[in-house]
């Protein structure tokens, strides 16, 4: 292959590669909302990535400087196991299952949060964890279901 051929191939491949990279980046940082988007409140300083928010049964609030890894799901909705057929699909509680993610909280990749619950400020939820209850501020939780791993020391300067 001549130098000219390699140069032309490189020039043609670069813009296409850039477009593909941009499309992938856009998908990695786009979150989805199931339900009324007005029930989702995300502080502008929060970093969300490609999360799924289900607001069918409550509000979801994400505080300042909170951040999510990839593929985090926050669900307020659930279905009544005592219903059957179409009624099981449609009998959904419409409120009261709010989720609050506190200031500076970190939800690592593949975390699943089932409301109602509150994740305290500066708490850390380890990758792959299942949150089914409140998480205290300044704690690390992990597992399915998430349980306390340790407390995070904090002082006036770091708070």
Where are the language model's segments positioned?
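Conserved acidic donor-binding loop of glycosyltransferase catalytic domains
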Residues: 75, 126, 132-133, 149-151
């Amino acid at each position: 292959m001549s130098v000219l051929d390699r140069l032309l191939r490189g020039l043609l491949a670069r813009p296409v590669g850039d477009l593909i990279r941009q499309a992938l980046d856009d998908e990695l940082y786009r979150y989805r909302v199931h339900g009324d988007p007005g029930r989702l409140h995300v502080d502008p300083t929060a970093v969300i990535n490609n999360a799924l928010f289900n607001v069918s049964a409550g509000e979801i609030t994400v505080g300042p400087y909170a951040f999510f890894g990839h593929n985090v799901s926050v669900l307020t909705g659930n279905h009544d196991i005592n219903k059957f057929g179409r009624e099981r699909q449609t009998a959904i509680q419409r409120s009261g299952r709010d989720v609050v993610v506190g200031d500076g909280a970190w939800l690592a990749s593949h975390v699943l949060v089932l409301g109602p619950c509150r994740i305290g400020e500066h708490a850390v939820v380890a990758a792959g964890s299942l949150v089914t209850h409140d998480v205290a501020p300044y704690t690390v939780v992990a597992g399915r279901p998430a349980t306390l791993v340790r407390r995070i020391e904090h002082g006036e300067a770091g708070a």
